[in-house]
Each structure stands twice: as structure tokens, then as C-alpha cells.
């Protein structure tokens, strides 16, 4: 369901592209350093957007550097890391884990079960670090799953539930920006859900999987 919030490369300036890539690579390195390769493969462009947004808003002290990786073994890539990349890495792993749990319970995807087992020990610490967010995300994913099982056809209701999950991710701190960030996360989450439903509708109909647009 993720991967829709990406940069428009043909329209972006070189310096802005370099800035974007540095935060993307920074989040990638953060995931690897905190959670190993199992965390690193959960990297998404959507969470990179969250990093850039929150970094621009809060302006935390940002560490700049460069590094090589498997994807770029020869040329070093610019990297930016800060407290926002740490938070985003945590949220990325937390959300990935509980989404895998739901995929296993709903569709019995063996790959989802295996991945959730790998992340399980790491997520226990995150549950303690972010108890309110963890409970909220679990509850909302469970509600989303139940509505899918019941064949809910109100796409706005379904999208709204996913929007509430994203608003939890966007609300980094309880401060003057919280309400605005929650609202932004909510509507962006709805947008992501709607795009995903539209993209998958033909395949879901063919495979007899749930999709709120399947009977339109």
C-alpha cells in the first residue's frame, strides 16, 4: 500500500534531488544501524517524505556525511541523519510489523509471517518506547481488517481508517504543530488508500480479493 509518495524527478532541481536522496539514504542507513538488513528492506519513499517534512518543520541538528552501500558500491552517496530519521525508522518498522501480522491473519501469507517473526523482538522495544502510538496503530489495523472481512463497500470509511493510521505517524510530538500534522497525515493516508484500491482493483477482482471498488 506504500510507495505512492515519490518525487517528480523531471521537475526537480539537481540540488533538491541531492537533498532528497541524502534523506532517503539517511533513513536507509538509520534502519540498517538500528534494525539490521531486516529493517532496511522495509524502507519506503512515503516515510522519506515524512522525514523531509518533519525535518523542514522542526529543523533538528542534522548530521551530514557520505557512505557506500550494496546499491552504490563505488560512488559514495550523501547522507543526512537526525532525530527525525530515528523516529521515522522506528515508525517504519512498527507499521511494517503489524501490517505483516494482519496479512498473515487475513490472507495467510507465509512471507508476511516470516518477516513479522524476524521483526518481532525489535518491535517489543518499540511497543514500550511508543505505547500510545503502538496501541493506536494496532487498533486501527484491526478495524481495517474487520471491515475488509465484512466486505465494507464505503470506500471513504475504509480510506478514513487508513488515514487515521498515517496521522499517528505524522504527529511526532504533542505541540503546536500536532493538529495540523495529524490533519495532513489523515488526508494523505486517505489518498494513498484510494490510489492503492484503484491500482489493485482488476487484480483483486481476478483473484477474488477484497477491494472497496470491486463493485463500482
Named regions from a protein language model:
Residues 216:
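Conserved small/polar residues in nucleotide/adenosyl-binding loops
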Residues 102, 140, 144-147, 168, ...:
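Active-site helical microenvironments for divalent-metal-assisted chemistry
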Residues 42-61, 65-81, 87-117, 180-203:
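Active-site alpha-helical segments that house and flank conserved acidic catalytic motifs
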Residues 98-109, 128, 132, 171, ...:
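Alpha-helix capping at helix-to-loop junctions
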Residues 1-80, 129-148, 155, 159-160:
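Conserved N-terminal diphosphate/IPP-binding helix and adjacent helical/loop segment
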Residues 151-155, 159-195:
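A mid-sequence, solvent-exposed acidic-amphipathic segment
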Residues 108-143:
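Long amphipathic alpha-helical segments that form oligomerization/scaffold cores
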Residues 201-202, 207-212:
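Active/binding-pocket-proximal capping segment
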Amino acid at each position: 500500500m506504500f510507495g505512492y509518495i515519490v518525487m517528480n524527478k523531471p521537475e526537480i532541481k539537481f540540488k533538491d534531488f541531492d537533498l532528497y536522496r541524502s534523506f532517503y539514504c539517511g533513513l536507509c542507513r538509520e534502519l540498517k544501524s538500528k534494525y539490521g538488513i531486516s529493517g532496511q528492506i522495509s524502507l519506503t519513499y512515503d516515510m522519506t517524505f515524512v522525514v523531509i517534512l518533519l525535518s523542514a518543520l522542526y529543523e533538528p541538528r542534522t548530521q551530514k556525511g557520505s557512505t557506500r552501500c550494496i546499491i552504490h558500491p563505488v560512488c559514495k552517496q550523501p547522507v543526512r541523519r537526525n532525530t527525525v530519521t530515528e523516529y521515522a525508522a522506528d515508525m517504519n518498522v512498527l507499521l511494517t510489523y503489524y501490517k505483516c501480522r494482519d496479512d498473515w491473519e487475513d490472507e495467510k501469507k507465509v512471507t508476511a509471517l516470516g518477516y513479522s517473526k524476524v521483526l518481532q523482538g525489535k518491535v517489543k522495544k518499540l511497543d514500550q518506547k511508543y505505547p500510545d502510538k503502538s496501541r493506536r496503530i494496532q487498533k486501527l489495523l484491526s478495524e481495517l481488517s474487520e471491515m475488509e472481512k465484512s466486505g465494507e463497500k464505503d470506500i471513504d470509511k475504509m480510506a478514513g481508517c487508513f488515514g487515521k493510521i498515517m496521522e499517528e505517524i505524522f504527529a511526532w510530538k504533542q505541540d503546536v504543530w500536532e493538529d495540523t500534522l495529524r490533519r495532513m497525515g489523515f488526508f494523505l493516508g486517505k489518498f494513498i488508500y484510494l490510489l492503492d484500491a484503484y491500482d489493485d482493483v482488476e487484480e483483486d477482482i481476478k483473484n477474488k480479493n477484497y477491494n472497496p471498488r470491486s463493485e463500482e
